[in-house]
């Protein structure tokens, strides 16, 4: 979802968050952009600016990283514009006190700075299907050409930036995981993506979440797990502590090598809104947090339908 609705309502009552939570409960992996409010007009870093539905704990909320025009990942950084956590939405309790969600977000980051994308055929604003961005900001196409785009007629490319550019990469990764293992539940997809993410140096949890998207590692971990998890859970035959590993499988080595560089996975996932969880048991044993119908944030637990 490329949505960034500004609002102050808690995920408990926010309409977009409730709709996303219902979709997750139905077995749909929901990916949302974090928003682009990580920097104030004066250039100061801003925390607590995650937008809805990215405020929803069950959603995979994605921030943007800057790959700096290189294939290697050691120089990647979180973009200045990418919204930082935690969520600051809330509600007024019956006793008059204000509840603030304070959910750890974003969940991870993906490339979202000057990424090449397709341009609509007609770039004239007055023409049908005109590409307003390309017309107003021709430098976006010039930047693509500088990256090597041939700019053939009807095949033009432009540079795009934003968490709305990063989120589709994670949505695609989630689809690849479900292709590799159709038995994954949405919370398990999220945990795998976080656990296998690459931590970026000099970035904290509220800037990068668990780290940068690592599809290679995520697929390896997904393939090591049973392919009947979602079905067994729906049938009521899977309970906390049951074996998650597929027959004859063991957990993969918790590192990846991409473009000649080896890095360790983050080996963390978010749970309960503000908790970090780790350890092999996250994926060797079934955890109740992998039930898509449950939402747990601090002292609140919801059964979603």
Stretches found by the model and what they are:
Residues 36:
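Conserved A3 ("GATE") glycine/threonine-rich loop of ANL adenylate-forming enzymes
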Residues 3-7, 11, 15-33, 43, ...:
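Topogenic and prosegment regions of secretory-pathway hydrolases and membrane enzymes
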């Amino acid at each position: 979802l490329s949505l960034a609705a500004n609002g102050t309502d808690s995920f408990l009552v926010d309409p977009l968050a409730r709709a996303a939570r219902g979709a997750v409960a139905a077995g749909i992996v929901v990916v949302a952009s974090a928003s682009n409010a990580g920097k104030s007009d004066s250039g100061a870093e801003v925390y607590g600016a995650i937008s809805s539905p990215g405020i929803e704990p069950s959603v995979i909320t994605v921030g943007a990283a800057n790959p700096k025009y290189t294939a290697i990942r050691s120089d990647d950084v979180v973009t200045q514009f990418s919204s930082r956590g935690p969520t600051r939405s809330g509600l007024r309790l019956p006793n008059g006190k204000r509840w603030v969600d304070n959910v750890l977000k974003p969940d991870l980051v993906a490339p979202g700075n000057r990424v090449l994308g397709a341009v609509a055929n007609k770039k004239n604003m007055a023409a049908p299907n005109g590409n307003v961005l390309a017309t107003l900001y021709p430098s976006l196409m010039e930047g693509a050409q500088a990256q090597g785009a041939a700019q053939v007629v009807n095949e033009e490319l432009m540079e795009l930036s934003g968490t709305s550019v990063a989120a589709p990469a994670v949505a695609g990764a989630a689809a690849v995981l479900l292709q590799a293992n159709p038995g994954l539940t949405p919370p398990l997809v999220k945990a795998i993506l976080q656990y296998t993410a690459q931590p970026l140096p000099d970035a904290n949890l509220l800037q990068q979440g668990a780290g940068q998207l690592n599809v290679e590692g995520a697929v390896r971990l997904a393939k090591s797990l049973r392919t009947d998890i979602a079905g067994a859970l729906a049938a009521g035959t899977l309970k906390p502590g049951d074996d998650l590993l597929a027959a004859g499988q063991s957990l993969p080595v918790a590192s990846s090598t991409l473009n000649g560089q080896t890095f360790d996975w983050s080996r963390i996932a978010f749970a309960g809104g503000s908790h970090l969880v780790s350890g092999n048991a996250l994926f060797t044993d079934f955890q109740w947090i992998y039930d898509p119908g449950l939402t747990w944030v601090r002292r609140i637990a919801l059964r979603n339908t």
